[in-house]
UniProtKB/Swiss-Prot annotation:
Family: Belongs to the anhydro-N-acetylmuramic acid kinase family.
Catalytic activity of the protein: 1,6-anhydro-N-acetyl-beta-muramate + ATP + H2O = N-acetyl-D-muramate 6-phosphate + ADP + H(+)
Keywords in alphabetical order: ATP-binding, Carbohydrate metabolism, Kinase, Nucleotide-binding, Transferase
Signal peptide, first to last residue: none
Keyword Kinase: yes
Organism of origin: Rhizobium meliloti (strain 1021)
EC identifiers of the protein: 2.7.1.170
UniProt binding sites for ATP: G13, T14, S15, M16, D17, G18, I19, D20
One biological process term in Gene Ontology: amino sugar metabolic process
Name of the protein in its database record: Anhydro-N-acetylmuramic acid kinase
Name of the gene: anmK
Highest taxon, organism lineage: Bacteria
Role, per record: Catalyzes the specific phosphorylation of 1,6-anhydro-N-acetylmuramic acid (anhMurNAc) with the simultaneous cleavage of the 1,6-anhydro ring, generating MurNAc-6-P. Is required for the utilization of anhMurNAc either imported from the medium or derived from its own cell wall murein, and thus plays a role in cell wall recycling.
Amino acid sequence: MGRVLTAIGLMSGTSMDGIDIAVVRTDGDSIVDRGPSAGYAYDPRFRERLKQGLEDARSILKREERPGTLADLERDLTLRHALAVRMFLQENNILPDNVNVIGFHGQTVLHRPDQALTVQLGDGELLARETGIDVVYDMRANDMTHGGQGAPLIPAYHAALARGLSKVGEIATPVVFVNIGGISNLTYIGAGEEIVAYDSGPGNTLIDQWVEAHAGIPYDQGGMIASEGGVLRELADRYLSHPFFSAEKRRSLDRNDFAPPAAGDASLEDGARTLAHVTAAGIVRSARHLPANPATYIVCGGGRLNSVIMSDLHALAEAEGARVLAAEALDLNGDSMEAEAWAYLAVRSRYCLPLTYPGTTGVSCPVSGGRLAAKPGRIAAVS
């Protein structure tokens, strides 16, 4: 592999609540060190602009189009990322010259894998100018060009983490990493480092939309609202009978593929409780499409902080002989893992290593990806 690089990863997920930042040192294969991490929340007004951006993006037919508010939103989003990077570096006493590359995810506003169309707002050239650091961005597009779904991309990082955990005997295999973000996704690491990955269903997005619409708050903190309700079986079955869960061919999801319940379908508490169950049950049902039954689930993402989701996931997984662990039980950071992954992927991109595989996105062959925006004053190169 190449020399070890210091990379910063930037992630703004489907929950649209803020920017996660993390540092990773890697040669593109092994993870040499996981450094500091932090989160920077968006203010409510900017979150509303992002929601409007989702609506404006519905009319996009080509990746480069920016109808409605999207051009201004992309610039403002990028500048907020640049400010977050500067704050993060200052808070952690890191000089920009000591960072080799930034992996910039941007904000997904449209994802239509059936049309080979994915749009992440984020101006890599502007971010490189504002931070003085090389930026790798737009990492999903090349996968789609080669027949992939454009998601998930994190499995390459999960595989690197699993190698490290297996060496010290901390987990039983096969292991499945579960990321419960707005959408939940699974990464299966089997014998011989076989990697299979796909989206598993709604994560937090339906719960977030439900409680925001009916309680005026952005999310159900810790699952407190859900803990006061009961599972409405008819409503849960309506979601779990969706063809997505039974289809043999797995596909990536957009946050609009599942809609929250109608106002009259449930009380606030019962709705939150039922949707938490759907998240957990969707994970276990989707895992039945894997090559072998998981022995260990490692859970990361914001959903692991919802006690009701985790309780249901423990019960459902244990009924099938699997153990469920939060990332922190293995000295991993469940909040920053996606940002860490984007740092890792940026280094792999710089070394032209694969980001995606046939078993993760359905791409025709292992492919690299990402576009490089060099910091001002030089053409970026890796030596």
